[in-house]
């Protein structure tokens, strides 16, 4: 708007001189007031601290961008406050821009720092809020970063042909190396001015040295001039490999033997996966623990079981042995020696009485039970009968899992007692009270064993009943545990039945002397279609009932002992399971009373053995096998 004349009005009329003077005075007053106001504003701005204004704005930002706590003020209030503070700060900056340029520069730096902090707070707040609101599945995964161009992976030479396998022949080595060289023809080479990376620091590992040494010797023996190393390898690594291979060629024959052992181990590992076996004629078999299953069976396990139960000999090539053998071990040599001398104790007529242990006849090294399959070992009293000898599975069997300590073999550690084979019924429950040792339950029908609950404690046989004869034995004689291992029984009237092996073929005089005991014996006829083996030994069980006076020292009960005097521990154990029973009555007197069996005249009690406990006749009312079995079951119910 242009400057207006003081002598005229807005419409252009001429003013009175008095009005003109008053108008000019008012104009000057307004101008002075404006100047005054500007000075007051400048003074107020100079009184304010710009740094304090920055701090106030930072507090507002922290209040606004706090992801944990909601701001105390409203968003609109925060925005208005920040706007006013920002305008004030701008006026101060303009004021100092005109009056003091240095202060102006400092204020601009403060403003930049504030803006940086505000941006960081805003980013942090947004990231936290987004993380709270977004789902994990919606977050896009980052792409795989590309390899930096400074690393030239293409220029690194790939290794040459792999060393040939130790299972391949020398004729295949040349073919494999030529094929690998042809396959590596497309590998890019290094540029002209570049050197490939050298070998790692330090000497090569011993496996690499042995590998190159074996390759060098194999090539030299085969006369092949095939080049094993690719041209792209470093010359330094070549020279090192050559030096180490030369040092390997100068090594002694012991190193070659160790290399052969390692090759054998690798070959065995490969055989485990591929199922093929490569064996060199000059290589000895490695001394390592192997699990071998020999299956050359021409008859079924059921037929073998029936042959064993009937007393017939099962051919050795028809057995199925699963044993853990140690090649080149002394135990196997001792067992082989003992197996060649096994038939001699079978025909020995001078056997001890049933109560005499065979500790004097057996060296202590043979007391430990070797791992056998099939029935339980012969050292302890036999396990519960009526157990079909199925195919072996698992570790060598021992006594039942819950058997007391006196039922365990003397030399068998507890670690070897594994679970029984899968086809066998479970043994007696663990923790049963120590009672009489297991024996055959008389009166069971012939044929396969019933599939009922397993018998808790098999009853002892009545006097004079011989179990089936064992198959021919091969191996050292088996030792029964001494009498001191068995605790006193709970019932003084239980019969003890230690079996002993007596030859079946005797002289007429001996047979006439023992006519009375054998007349009341329960003997096992051979199965139909077979003939009895005249040389097969017969196992007799002799019943002894101890008097209360002789057993009072051991707890007031009769001592029960069942000692199987069986020779061979290597083959399967004789099962005291009768297939057929025939009761022979006395021809002279038909009273039906069973006479007490006594040892034959040719069996003498050894001097180191205590005299046997006095015999007592059996109760006269137990006449048949069913009555004997019922009485025994009642007795066992009272015990258990």
From Swiss-Prot:
Basic and acidic residues: bias regions: 230-240, 252-274, 586-599
Keywords, in A-Z order: Coiled coil, Cytoplasm, mRNA processing, mRNA splicing, Nucleus, Phosphoprotein, rRNA processing
Feature: compositional bias, Low complexity: 356-371, 603-616
PANTHER family xrefs: WW DOMAIN-BINDING PROTEIN 11 (PTHR13361:SF1)
Coiled-coil residue windows: 75-122
Subcellular localization(s) per the UniProt record: Cytoplasm; Nucleus
One GO CC term on file: cytoplasm
Phosphoserine PTM positions: 285
Record field: compositional bias (Polar residues): 1-11
Residue ranges with Pro residues bias: 194-207, 372-412, 422-491
Biased composition (Acidic residues): 241-251, 315-338
Function description: Activates pre-mRNA splicing.
Chief localisation class: cytoplasm
Swiss-Prot/TrEMBL GO biological process terms: mRNA processing; RNA splicing; rRNA processing
Motif PGR in this chain: 421-432
Keyword Cell membrane recorded: no
Pfam family of the protein (one): Wbp11
Spans annotated as Disordered: 1-37, 155-174, 187-563, 582-625
Biased composition (Gly residues): 547-558
Protein name listed in UniProt: WW domain-binding protein 11
Keyword DNA damage (UniProt): no
Comp. bias (Basic residues): 28-37
